[in-house]
């Protein structure tokens, strides 16, 4: 059984707390504004019309899950840096980690379904299974999203058991001094953590990769058809393929980086106030923020809504 034990001082230098907090706060503010904006736009449309197209409904759920994730990360960082006695209580520590994993699972599932949905809309194959999925995806998507949430709850619940343990020692001697200090010790079962964590992200990551492969294969076939029948210039179908491939690749690469950062952070390989742990915190807060900006920039409707929002903000500030 692979166990990693690390420690964290109760008393730390001020810069070790303030700098990571400021950087993470900036990331979180950007992410909360971006994901909150998308959630409000599509949420308002859902209330007004009582229903949304499947793609917009997926974007609503994805942005809402990222908004919750961003808020939760901000709360966790605040407690970790400024209220360590509360955060490092064994039950509270497990609660923070379990909810973080659950929100990350939901985030990945919704992003995977969004990419699969647009892949099915763009790609054309004659295989019977593919044609059936293309016809049924709109009807099945609400059930698939609900199933994804249930799977995320089930898998993340295991993280509240025998993976993390925190205990405190109030009488750690200070070298060259007669006094003592308080230290928190973290024990992490890395084998169980790795097994459960990667088991939870395997299927949606596989869906991401398959969507990218199908898009690339379809684009290659479409390009060959164009070269044999026309001058080879781009058409709307090729533009749609290229846009979907770029978006899927961007999301996949960012999520892999985010997944590695989350695993390193939860495994407690580095100390709570170490440089590498601060880098992981920066990645975890920057990922939802960057994805929200990406969604707004690639969607014409959201871009127009964002310009209107900026216009209203400027008018308000001029009053």
UniProtKB/Swiss-Prot annotation:
Glycosylated residues, chain numbering:
169, 178
Q: Name one GO biological process term.
A: detection of chemical stimulus involved in sensory perception of bitter taste
Residue ranges, Extracellular side: 1-17, 88-98, 158-195, 273-276
Q: Which UniProt keywords apply?
A: G-protein coupled receptor, Glycoprotein, Membrane, Receptor, Sensory transduction, Taste, Transducer, Transmembrane, Transmembrane helix
Chief place where the protein resides: membrane
Which InterPro entries does the entry mention? TAS2R (IPR007960)
Q: Where in the cell is it found?
A: Membrane
For whether the record's keyword set contains Transmembrane, the answer is yes
Q: How does it sit in the membrane?
A: Multi-pass membrane protein
Which SUPFAM superfamilies does this entry report, sorted A to Z? Family A G protein-coupled receptor-like (SSF81321)
Q: Does the keyword GTP-binding apply?
A: no
* Gene3D superfamilies in the cross-refs: Rhodopsin 7-helix transmembrane proteins
* Transmembrane portions of the chain: 18-38, 67-87, 99-119, 137-157, 196-216, 252-272, 277-297
Residue intervals on the Cytoplasmic side: 39-66, 120-136, 217-251, 298-319
Gene Ontology CC = membrane
GO MF terms, alphabetically ordered: bitter taste receptor activity; G protein-coupled receptor activity
- Family according to the record: Belongs to the G-protein coupled receptor T2R family.
The function of this protein is: Gustducin-coupled receptor implicated in the perception of bitter compounds in the oral cavity and the gastrointestinal tract. Signals through PLCB2 and the calcium-regulated cation channel TRPM5.
Q: Which PANTHER family match?
A: TASTE RECEPTOR TYPE 2 (PTHR11394), TASTE RECEPTOR TYPE 2 MEMBER 40 (PTHR11394:SF47)
Q: What else is known?
A: Several bitter taste receptors are expressed in a single taste receptor cell.
The name this protein carries in UniProt is Taste receptor type 2 member 40
Q: Which organism is it from?
A: Rattus norvegicus
